[in-house]
Amino acid sequence: MSNQLSPKPPVNPIVMGKIGSAYGIRGWLRVFSSTEDADSIFDYQPWFIQSKSGWQLVEIEGWKYHNQDLIIKVKGADDRDAANLLTNCEIVVDSSQLPDLGVGDYYWKDLIGCQVVTVTGYELGKIIDMMETGSNDVMVIKANLKDAFGVKERLVPFLTEQVVKRVDLSAQTIEVDWDPGF
């Protein structure tokens, strides 16, 4: 019997990846990581998944690369049927584990929900998602209901200095130099 305290469920949950399909017959599973370097997902422990009864701790026995896939062995999932029960579950950790960022760097989770306003004061809408492209991140902005340009959604590059002029996370606003008609 262990004297270790059981890890506490996340207070500020953040999704770090997703458990994919079973791999083989011994309970291994594919993992899809949302971290910049795929295997960095293992730096954030403990993992939790959301189940009908609440947060469930996921203990990793091991992990490895197989071809281009990351695969994991979860404690208690010793066959394909047990592994299949975890398929499509989101991997969640407490956001307090994320490292502090430097000035001018932001986590996407902090940008989502911010109101985006042009330098002329036109409200473009709220960020509902972020996308990664080959060259830069892009804000997915849901336009206001009565948008003068009839736009429902805008894609605006998150380029500091060129497009993004000011980010105020405490006020949940981002000022951009962007043509609302574009």
UniProtKB/Swiss-Prot annotation:
Cellular compartment(s): Cytoplasm
Signal sequence residues: none
Keyword Nucleotide-binding assigned: no
Alphabetized UniProt keyword annotations: Chaperone, Cytoplasm, Ribosome biogenesis, rRNA processing
Single GO term (MF): ribosome binding
Residue ranges of domain PRC barrel in the record: 103-182
GO cellular component: cytoplasm; ribosome
Gene3D superfamilies, per database record: PRC-barrel domain (2.30.30.240), RimM (2.40.30.60)
Subunit structure, interactors included: Binds ribosomal protein uS19.
PANTHER family: RIBOSOME MATURATION FACTOR RIMM
Protein name per UniProt: Ribosome maturation factor RimM
Gene for this chain: rimM
